[in-house]
């Protein structure tokens, strides 16, 4: 297993080169340091390369980060699921919010989502750890692709390459 980077390693952004364009994500290290480290390090290791946005719900969110593409896979850099980092100042107030997908409290792994609209019912249930700082138009276009009855895109939308800045 690769070493976990030191606490001093805090790249401000992660870039997602997708089959539909580039998304630049700003990370909220002050509010969710463990989650940011997990996401940035998985990106640095190439974990997200070649994965797809496996769940897309119009006017709600786009979800990715599962190497199996099923919505049931993925692991953190910590070797297991890890705890939520819920911050009272961070709310699901609009489009472009980056958060961890989970299966209940303290079940974070590698899957993440980006909101397409305000989703206040998620406040206090998912760790918010960043936002889209470039490419929100591209995120919105991903949110409009045709999906099947299980919210899976008919045509794959892939993360070709993910990498941290610096």
Curated annotation (Swiss-Prot):
> What InterPro entries does the annotation carry?
Cyclophilin-like_dom_sf (IPR029000), Cyclophilin-type_PPIase (IPR024936), Cyclophilin-type_PPIase_CS (IPR020892), Cyclophilin-type_PPIase_dom (IPR002130), Cyclophilin_A-like (IPR044666)
Fetch the SUPFAM superfamilies from UniProt: Cyclophilin-like
Q: Which GO terms describe its biological process?
A: embryonic brain development; mRNA splicing, via spliceosome; protein folding; protein peptidyl-prolyl isomerization
Tissue distribution of the protein = Ubiquitous, with the most abundant expression in heart and skeletal muscle.
Tell me the residues on which Phosphoserine occurs. 149
- Provide the binding site for cyclosporin A: 54-65, 70-71, 99-104, 109-113, 119, 125
| Organism superkingdom | Eukaryota
Result of altering residue 107 to A: In PCH14; uncertain significance; reduced interaction with SNW1; no effect on protein expression level, but shows reduced thermal stability and increased aggregation propensity in vitro
Residues folding into a coiled coil are none
Q: What is the effect of changing residue 127 to A?
A: In PCH14; reduced protein levels in homozygous patient's fibroblasts compared to heterozygous or wild-type cells
Catalytic activity field: [protein]-peptidylproline (omega=180) = [protein]-peptidylproline (omega=0)
The main place the protein resides is nucleus
Query: What modulates its activity?
Result: Inhibited by Cyclosporin A.
What mutagenesis or variant effect is reported for residue 109 to C? In PCH14; uncertain significance
Entry EC no(s): 5.2.1.8
Where does the record say this protein resides?
A: Nucleus
Q: Which GO terms describe its molecular function?
A: disordered domain specific binding; peptidyl-prolyl cis-trans isomerase activity
Q: Which GO terms describe its cellular component?
A: catalytic step 2 spliceosome; nucleoplasm; nucleus; U2-type catalytic step 2 spliceosome
Which residues does the UniProt record annotate as the domain PPIase cyclophilin-type? 10-164
What's the stated role of this polypeptide? Involved in pre-mRNA splicing as component of the spliceosome. PPIases accelerate the folding of proteins. Catalyzes the cis-trans isomerization of proline imidic peptide bonds in oligopeptides. Catalyzes prolyl peptide bond isomerization in CDC40/PRP17. Plays an important role in embryonic brain development; this function is independent of its isomerase activity.
* Protein family according to the UniProt entry: Belongs to the cyclophilin-type PPIase family. PPIL1 subfamily.
What disease is mentioned for this protein?
Answer: Pontocerebellar hypoplasia 14: A form of pontocerebellar hypoplasia, a disorder characterized by structural defects of the pons and cerebellum, evident upon brain imaging. PCH14 is a severe autosomal recessive form characterized by progressive microcephaly, and poor or absent psychomotor development with severely impaired intellectual development apparent from birth. Other features may include hypotonia, spastic quadriplegia, and early-onset seizures. Early death may occur in some patients.
Q: How does it assemble?
A: Identified in the spliceosome C complex. Interacts with SNW1/SKIP. Interacts with CDC40/PRP17; this interaction leads to CDC40 isomerization. Interacts with RBM22.
Q: Which PANTHER family match?
A: PEPTIDYL-PROLYL CIS-TRANS ISOMERASE-RELATED, PEPTIDYLPROLYL ISOMERASE DOMAIN AND WD REPEAT-CONTAINING PROTEIN 1
Quote the protein name from its UniProt record: Peptidyl-prolyl cis-trans isomerase-like 1
Please name the gene that encodes this protein. Answer: PPIL1
